[in-house]
Amino acid sequence: SNRHQDQVCLIGAKDSYHSTYSQVCEVAVPDARFNDKDQLTYQPVPFATLLDGLRDSFSAALDCEPVAEDYALSNQGQELYGMMTWRLPESEHSGLALALRSSYNSSIAPAFGVGEAVFVCANGSFSVDGMIKSARQTTNVMETLRELTRDVSSTAISDFRAMAEETAGWRDVAVKDDLFYAYCGLLFGRKVISSQLFSTAIKYWNACRDGSLHREHATENLWSAYQAVTAAMQRSGPRDSFRGYGGLHHVTRAVFNSGGCVEGSSQIPSLDVEAAMRVATN
């Protein structure tokens, strides 16, 4: 599996460091704060409570334990960033990843998001191709988090399973170099990826093809094309990839609908992104 998908990034995050679960749990939990009327204004969620709650809830809903957990602490241990990944029977090639962040210094409310491609960085960057939920650390924050977790674990898992089913078919669609360049061009033109990501995706595709990078992404098919773009998106650590991942799906679906390259030919088939978008919104 791609190790960078299961790791928390430290790019541009000074004084941050990778941490074990026990190191995260050792950080002292600050006291709750009250105003002069004795009303609760800040109720910290212990990092251990957040992690255990998310892990238990998702593991129960998925009926399996996570295969990887990665954490980073920043700002003298006051900010937490992490990722948990589960492998599901529906998809041997991709995991369901949960990215999370929280803090003890009021800088970040506890938030988590799930999807097939997620990115979390200790500099605050956070992007998910699924949904993100956040809870302010005030009254009832624990109950709010419990409700959010229940809601997300059930919805996200059914979304992921549908997605895994769809992407499985992408391996049967041939994508030659020229179609991949056209695919990236559409993504760039539609503002799904930047010019820098365009260039990174092409480099990733070429590196996989010449054997210097992931062998399993070297096959000339739509799955490898999609992986090249998500790898580029993850490496850049975009702050807001919601629009990005949504747009990526529409364009990928358009390539799938075209049938891809015909065997023995590198001709680019006609692509109808608008039709793929209409299907997605119906």
Question: Model features per residue range: what roles?
Answer:
Residues 1-53, 57-63:
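Feature for intrinsically disordered/low-complexity regulatory segments and propeptides
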